[in-house]
């Protein structure tokens, strides 16, 4: 018990002295989730695209917009701090297979119990993206931000 308490105080000290924000502490816990990525095993069947409540899934080589499937308009600052023009076409993330725009993916949190793309994918190529780690709270905030509810 004493070691756990000492560890907690050590972590608290680092947060206070080094100026870590509380949101950074959340990234250390085990309740983190990740945006979904479509792997190169994709067979381009398209089953995933209509299932996404955020319109975050696009066909290979398709340009995409932040405003598609959301209530975002004009210049916006995303929850991750990035400023974008919601109406501007974005470059495709993949030229070979379907892709998911990570800034729009909420893992269906706030809509469904599980990511719908993964639920319908016949080859199980919709998997967590380890490069885009977010908490459930962050994903819910992103959903609310995009859909204004």
Task: Describe the role of every protein-language-model region.
Residues 10, 15, 27-34, 58-149:
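Flanking helices and flexible, charged tails adjoining ferredoxin-like Fe-S electron-transfer domains
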Residues 37-38:
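Local sequence-structure signature of Cys/Sec-based thiol-disulfide redox active-site neighborhoods
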Residues 43-53, 106, 118-122:
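Cys/His/Pro-rich metal-binding microdomains
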